[in-house]
Amino acid sequence: MASQGTKRSYEQMETDGERQNATEIRASVGKMIDGIGRFYIQMCTELKLSDYEGRLIQNSLTIERMVLSAFDERRNKYLEEHPSAGKDPKKTGGPIYKRVNGKWMRELVLYDKEEIRRIWRQANNGDDATAGLTHMMIWHSNLNDTTYQRTRALVRTGMDPRMCSLMQGSTLPRRSGAAGAAVKGVGTMVMELIRMIKRGINDRNFWRGENGRKTRIAYERMCNILKGKFQTAAQRAMMDQVRESRNPGNAEIEDLIFLARSALILRGSVAHKSCLPACVYGPAVASGYDFEKEGYSLVGIDPFKLLQNSQVYSLIRPNENPAHKSQLVWMACNSAAFEDLRVSSFIRGTKVIPRGKLSTRGVQIASNENMDTMESSTLELRSRYWAIRTRSGGNTNQQRASAGQISVQPTFSVQRNLPFDKTTIMAAFTGNAEGRTSDMRAEIIRMMEGAKPEEVSFQGRGVFELSDEKATNPIVPSFDMSNEGSYFFGDNAEEYDN
């Protein structure tokens, strides 16, 4: 079966659409953006936020989280059935920041979920507008991917922390649908499957009975999603083995870890979408821009143009560097957490530096942080060029890569060689070549051995001037091949904790 992505474009996944032509897709994505924008404007009115406060990214995150929580059916049901002290299952809220007498103040707001759902539906012509909710989830996921390194989660499932380039979308909720599945990295899918298999090993009823049947269907569906991300026959054949296993256990976990490692060189197809915070869409809609009429795409020039003309602010802690905070958010907006820094730097027009060198913590402010010393500054989210987002892993070749991250997952469709540390990766493939998947393993290892350093990915693809809306004149950048391009380079990023 061909990859899931070939059947429906992202935008169709994004809008649950049947087959549509490009104009219809652009309109339906635009409609989704309009809905988010209208909702945001209404929430700013409800919360009595000034224009500046409404453009504060921390307020945007709180408002986005409130609506996502209001529509989280499963968790809402769970909260109703398992009341915990001090948590009202019918309410949602969070910190809202306001400027009072020249100082930033934190105010905790609480709303009925029913009320939030009403405002959201009203902004979306009465629909639940699931696509818009998923869009916000992907924005949060992209921000997490940029901010945190998932070392602990990788180690817990038996994977190597240096495989972090495979972990796109690892914090996306289960309910993120087809659009969410499209942006998940190979490592994320492998981790979800391993967790599932481990539960089955520890709980003998996991695969049994009516519930077990549903579990099995979910397991096979996840296997198919992962299979669809692989681009070689041998990797797909191995996924068939994992999917068809009568009683998934340690052999399957081994196979999955093997496949994840192989994806560092034989990269999977992972979609990239520029999902922006609601505080970007709100002001654009308020200024009279009609996204549905004009059309919008998450993978073309549109997000770049929107960011060129947007003012977004962020709270800054005393010893943080505002330029570094801007880089963090720029990468999140462009879904570029695992992109080669050489490519990101060229497109952005300013040097994009590794996570470990950034003097900034995450965007969110913890409830116990002191507000007295908080400043705010403008986030610089503009770019020098734009480029088309890719949903392929690029073809394979090799290059020196770093200690902290041994491969990349390209975001932009731009000609370059893809760095990965072949000796480090291949060292993990010694021994264990027996068992039912041995012939496929041998074939995969052979392909990895054959990956050459001089090969170029995305041949002839370039970046474009922001005035070149139709992408007519590609500028193919030349990169310093000796330079090193990993973001989580020998890194000290914070861990992601739910």
From Swiss-Prot:
Any one GO cellular component localisation term in the record: helical viral capsid
InterPro entries per UniProt: Flu_NP (IPR002141)
Domain of life: Viruses
Post-translational modification as stated in the protein's UniProt record: Late in virus-infected cells, may be cleaved from a 56-kDa protein to a 53-kDa protein by a cellular caspase. This cleavage might be a marker for the onset of apoptosis in infected cells or have a specific function in virus host interaction.
Keyword line: Capsid protein, Helical capsid protein, Host nucleus, Host-virus interaction, Ribonucleoprotein, RNA-binding, Viral nucleoprotein, Viral penetration into host nucleus, Virion, Virus entry into host cell
Family annotation (SUPFAM superfamilies): flu NP-like
Short sequence motif named Unconventional nuclear localization signal, residue ranges: 1-18
Region (Disordered): 1-21
GO MF entries: RNA binding; structural molecule activity
Pfam families with a match to the protein in the record: Flu_NP (PF00506)
Subcellular localization: Virion; Host nucleus
Span of the annotated motif Bipartite nuclear localization signal: 198-216
Gene Ontology biological process terms in this record: symbiont entry into host cell; viral penetration into host nucleus
Basic and acidic residues bias (residue ranges): 8-21
Main subcellular location: virion
Family, as annotated: Belongs to the influenza viruses nucleoprotein family.
Function, in words: Encapsidates the negative strand viral RNA, protecting it from nucleases. The encapsidated genomic RNA is termed the ribonucleoprotein (RNP) and serves as template for transcription and replication. The RNP needs to be localized in the host nucleus to start an infectious cycle, but is too large to diffuse through the nuclear pore complex. NP comprises at least 2 nuclear localization signals that are responsible for the active RNP import into the nucleus through cellular importin alpha/beta pathway.
Assembly mode: Homomultimerizes to form the nucleocapsid. May bind host exportin-1/XPO1. Binds to viral genomic RNA. Protein-RNA contacts are mediated by a combination of electrostatic interactions between positively charged residues and the phosphate backbone and planar interactions between aromatic side chains and bases.
Protein name per Swiss-Prot or TrEMBL: Nucleoprotein
Organism: Influenza A virus (strain A/Singapore/1/1957 H2N2)
Lineage: Viruses, Riboviria, Orthornavirae, Negarnaviricota, Polyploviricotina
